[in-house]
Design a protein with these regions (language model features):
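Short, well-ordered amphipathic alpha-helical segments that serve as non-catalytic structural scaffolds
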Residues: 121-128
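Beta-rich strand-turn-strand
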Residues: 130-140, 144, 150
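Catalytic-core "active-site belt" of small-molecule-metabolizing enzymes
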Residues: 1-116, 123, 154, 158, ...
């Protein structure tokens, strides 16, 4: 089981997410892409946990969501399963993800918590980057957004996200 050392984090939270791998370099001249062709750009899906860490010296409420996102001020670490699944392996509009702390169920989340379908987040990101002239490249990953609320990590806890047939992500925060 992976161990994350608390000395490298300030105020971390864990978010279970469905992630995607890019199949080939994306041709920006073919943008904008749509839900009809987005799957053709993707090699597969995998389960992951993003560790967000707030490194500001004032409370999150004083920073504001726009400032936080615009500075990429929360993304810090990404844990992922090595197994890549076919994108049609699950129903992305309704797939349950269970989140545990010390083997106690905290929440049964769902992929529909990510803009109703994680592919909507992927589509937005790819089209936004294409507009800026920044293509995504083969084998890059996209983490689509949390299926549950974010959970604070406390030293000495064990974290597990159960993605059903896509597998488990587990780690200990020491």
């Amino acid at each position: 089981m992976e161990k994350l050392n608390s000395k490298y984090f300030f105020e971390p939270f864990a978010e279970p997410e469905i992630s995607f791998r890019i199949k080939d370099d994306i041709d920006i001249s073919k943008a904008p892409y749509s839900m009809d062709n987005i799957k053709n750009l993707l090699d597969g899906i995998l389960c992951s946990i993003e560790i967000v860490d707030f490194r500001f010296n004032k409370p999150l409420a004083d920073i504001g969501a726009i400032n936080l996102v615009s500075t990429n001020g929360a993304s810090d670490y990404w844990i992922y399963n090595d197994k890549i699944y076919n994108i049609d392996e699950i129903d992305l509009t309704d797939f349950e993800v269970s989140f545990f702390i010390d083997n106690k169920l905290q929440e049964k989340g769902n992929t529909n918590n990510v803009l109703e379908n994680p592919l909507n987040a992927v589509l937005w990101l790819i089209n936004t980057l294409c507009k800026k002239g920044e293509p995504m490249l083969k084998n890059q990953f996209i983490s689509s957004g949390s299926c549950t609320k974010a959970y604070r990590l406390n030293t000495g806890t064990r974290i597990k996200a159960d993605f059903g047939k896509l597998g488990l992500i587990e780690f200990e925060y020491i």
